[in-house]
Curated annotation (Swiss-Prot):
It comes from Wigglesworthia glossinidia brevipalpis. Acetyl-CoA carboxylase is a heterohexamer composed of biotin carboxyl carrier protein (AccB), biotin carboxylase (AccC) and two subunits each of ACCase subunit alpha (AccA) and ACCase subunit beta (AccD). Belongs to the AccD/PCCB family. Keywords: ATP-binding, Cytoplasm, Fatty acid biosynthesis, Fatty acid metabolism, Lipid biosynthesis, Lipid metabolism, Metal-binding, Nucleotide-binding, Transferase, Zinc, Zinc-finger. Its cofactor is Zn(2+). InterPro entries: AcCoA_carboxyl_beta, Acetyl_CoA_COase_Trfase_b_su, ClpP/crotonase-like_dom_sf, COA_CT_N, Znf-ACC. Residues 23-286 form the CoA carboxyltransferase N-terminal domain. One of its GO terms (cellular component) is acetate CoA-transferase complex. Pfam families: Carboxyl_trans, Zn_ribbon_ACC. HAMAP family: AcetylCoA_CT_beta. This is Acetyl-coenzyme A carboxylase carboxyl transferase subunit beta. It comes from the Bacteria. One of its GO terms (molecular function) is carboxyl- or carbamoyltransferase activity.
Amino acid sequence: MSWIERILKKNTITKKTNIPEGIWVKCNNCNQMIYKIELEKNLEVCPKCNFHMRISARKRLEKFLDKNNILELGKNLEPKDILKFKDTKKYKDRLYIAQKLTKEKDAIIVMKGSLYKMPIVAAAFEFSFIGGSMSSVVGERFVFGVNESIKCNCPMVCFSASGGARVQEALISLMQMAKTSAALSKLRKKKIPYISVMTDPSMGGVSASIAMLGDINIAEPKALIGFAGPRVIEQTVREKLPDKFQKSEFLIQKGIIDLIIKRKNMRFSIGKLLAKITNKPEPKKE
């Protein structure tokens, strides 16, 4: 027994209670503590300040698509360390860590399903997998999605969340920009709608290719969108950048994106847009 316990009465001493990890999440915007279950129910959007946190690709697609008849495309494709690349870590070690962390094989998931009973192909980037970087597998899976969209004559939607091309795959990664853009040109020739949704962040080679090539370009609130980051630009031009530079609210004022849609409204809003474009009955709000 410590000296303080001898002085104070036992009933006035409160012993420290260990709170299990993972119950509370701190919002990066308002710094408020949020009950994790409440945050998950709110689609990873802070109920205090409406800040859109990052959400996993699989969870995003599960909440976006109708519940039944979902087929994952290109799920057997896995990245390979063709260049035997090594920086501070070997590329194959980075892949192993990322796969263990995310339970995914690479940084994009592509699914064929339906949205309010309308056939659709949807893709989503997994930012937790090496920053959602574009690899050869990401490019190939995306092209799988485009080809399936052409085959079924159904719209395609892509949710971007990426830092750009994957450094560890060098020129192979850069080539995916041209490859995916060429695939989207086939979609356009067939007059099949492609909607791009840019989430935080959509940067680098992804923003310079598939993220900006939508027939309709949508963004989530306060998403960082651009090629180089604002800090890099500021250091290069040596000038103070405008407030909220490269944020979705800034870009919509400049006409770079078409719409800003909150995550909770995304499913219905895109369903409504696609129904109008494809001349289908307008969906009823759930």
